[in-house]
Each structure stands twice: as C-alpha cells, then as structure tokens.
Amino acid sequence: MGLRDAQRVVPALRVASYAASKAFYESLGFREEWTHHVEPGLPTFASMMLDGMEIFLSEHSGDCQPGGLVHFYVPDVDALYDDFLAYGVNVEQAPNNDLGADLRVMSVLDPDNNRLKFLTQTHWE
C-alpha cells in the first residue's frame, strides 16, 4: 500500500487550553471522539469530529504552533453560516466569493487564533 492509496489526512492544531477549545469546537458542531494523556495531569491530545471531518487538538508544545489554518469543504457554507450564527459563533468573515465566483468561503478564529475556513465549491469542472 502506497501513499496513493491513502484516503485520510487529519490536521492537528495547537491549543493552550483543551477545555476552552473543546467548548469552542462544540459550539461549531464538533464532538469529542477521544482524548489521550500520557499520564494524568499531562497535556491533552484529542480528536474532534464534525460530519466525518476530523481534527486533532493538542496542548503539547512540541506538536505544532498556534496560528494554524485548516480548510473544510462543506456542502453548503451559507447554511453552515446560519447555523453558526444560531449557535452564537463569532464568524470572522461571512460567506463570500473573494476566492472566485465558483467558491464560497467563510472563516472563523478559534481561541488560539487558528483559522478555520469553510468552503463550498459551487461549480465543478
């Protein structure tokens, strides 16, 4: 099996407080799948899922740096925007076509300034 057969990539984002980040991601509709601690009291490494999309959140300082960027392709970014507003999410940038007529995009910042972009491709070649 080679890389060509790979079907899944999971980005990891650095967070200062897993508890605060978990609450934020749950406000977006994500749900905790699992958490891991090497020992009790040590930093948290966790998996969060939303409609089959997975991200890892890590309190471990050596894993990655705050200020990451992740793109999520979703079926309807405008409907998701409405959901986020109903959930009380502070959306950084409302859905727009700044990246081209065939791509709708909105962005949200998490508590650690990781940018999450949600995109809908409106036309496929």
Predicted regions span which residues?
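N-terminal beta-strand motif that seeds the catalytic metal site of vicinal oxygen chelate
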Residues: 1-22, 68-70, 119-125
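Short secondary-structure boundary/capping segments
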Residues: 1-3, 46-47, 60-62, 97-98, ...
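Residue-level marker for the onset of beta-strands and adjacent loop->beta junctions
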Residues: 9, 42-44, 68, 102-104
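Conserved catalytic-core motifs of GNAT/GCN5-like acyltransferases
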Residues: 12-14, 31-39, 96-98, 121-125
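Vicinal oxygen chelate
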Residues: 16-19, 50, 70-115
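Conserved acetyl-CoA-binding loop of GNAT-fold acetyltransferases
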Residues: 26-33, 89-90
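Conserved short beta-strand elements that form part of the metal-binding/catalytic scaffold
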Residues: 32-67, 115-120
